[in-house]
Structure formats: structure tokens, C-alpha cells
Regions:
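Catalytic cores of alpha/beta
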Residues: 1-2, 37-49, 85-108, 120, ...
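Long, low-complexity, intrinsically disordered polar/charged segments
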Residues: 1-8, 74, 78, 83-85
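Glycine-rich phosphate-binding active-site loops on the catalytic face of alpha/beta enzymes
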Residues: 1-17, 54-63, 101-122
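Short, well-ordered coil/turn segments that N-cap beta-strands
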Residues: 3-4, 28-30, 49-51, 79-81, ...
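Short loop-to-alpha-helix "cap/lid" segments that border enzyme active sites
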Residues: 13-23, 27, 37-48, 60-80, ...
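Short, hinge-like loop/turn segments at secondary-structure boundaries
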Residues: 24-26, 50-53, 71-72, 101-102, ...
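Long, charge-dense, solvent-exposed interaction surfaces that engage phosphate-rich ligands
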Residues: 32-36
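C-terminal helical cap(s) of enzyme catalytic domains, especially alpha/beta-barrels
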Residues: 73-76, 99, 112-136
Length: 136
């Protein structure tokens, strides 16, 4: 019945709120996942209490996705943070590209929701990721 992490949105919370909530999460034994969409949001963060930075690839104005958002924004995140890429990840090639740029984890949703057998689709997606196949 416990949680492992809290999900904090940089677009909604100010810098002090983000820092205070991340510190409180740490004091409770929780990880902090902070979602960012822009360079400005990243630069405003005090990342000392933040463990995981999740880069949202969806443009909030147009709702279009571009996985290169993660590639562009990763360079503004310290190397000691875990980086997650979310939205717009459709194929194993997308994951391979992101992995080649040092992205650690991925949120894949829409491609699994559009099919009748999401478990099978996930297995096929993972099988198509070169980085996953080479670890076996």
C-alpha cells in the first residue's frame, strides 16, 4: 500500500514548491520525478533534492510530440540524474535513438492503448529495441 515516488510538474509548481516537495518526499523515503517541458523549467529547478527528471515531448500548445525534445533538453540536466522521456515514443527505433543520447527510461502509452493486445504489442516493441536485444 505504499508509494515509491511522487510526480511533480514544473509547469504547475514554482521553484520553492518543487524543492520543498522533493525534500519532503526524500524525508519520507520516496523518489521525486519532476516533469519538465522546456529549458526554462529545467534551469529554474534546484535539483539538489530531485532524483528523476522526466522530459515531456508533447507541446502543450499544439499537442504535437517530438522525441527530439528529450535529446535537446537532456543537456541541461546534470549527469547524476535519471532521465525519463515521455510522450511520442512509438517504435523501438525511437527508444534506440533516445538511449543513444543517454536517456535512461521511457513512458510508452498511446501505442499500447491503440491495439487489442497491449501485452503482445509491448513484447514486440521491446524485442525491436536494439539496446534491449544486445543485453540478452
Amino acid at each position: 500500500y505504499g508509494g515509491d515516488a511522487v510526480f511533480l510538474l514544473a509547469a504547475v509548481l514554482d521553484t520553492k514548491q518543487l524543492h520543498d516537495l522533493a525534500e519532503e518526499a526524500t524525508s519520507l523515503g520516496l523518489e521525486s520525478v519532476v516533469e519538465v517541458r522546456t529549458e526554462d523549467e529545467i534551469e529554474a529547478l534546484d535539483m539538489s533534492a530531485m532524483d528523476i527528471i522526466s522530459i515531456n515531448n508533447r507541446n502543450p500548445d499544439s499537442f504535437e510530440t517530438d522525441i527530439y525534445t528529450s535529446v535537446r533538453l537532456k543537456k541541461f540536466v546534470p549527469n547524476d540524474k535519471i532521465i525519463v522521456s515521455e510522450c511520442g515514443i512509438e517504435t523501438g527505433k525511437d527508444i534506440d535513438l533516445l538511449m543513444s543520447h543517454g536517456i535512461h527510461a521511457f513512458v510508452v502509452g498511446e501505442p499500447l492503448l491503440r491495439v487489442e493486445e497491449p501485452g503482445r504489442a509491448l513484447a514486440e516493441l521491446l524485442h525491436s529495441v536494439e539496446g534491449v536485444r544486445s543485453r540478452r
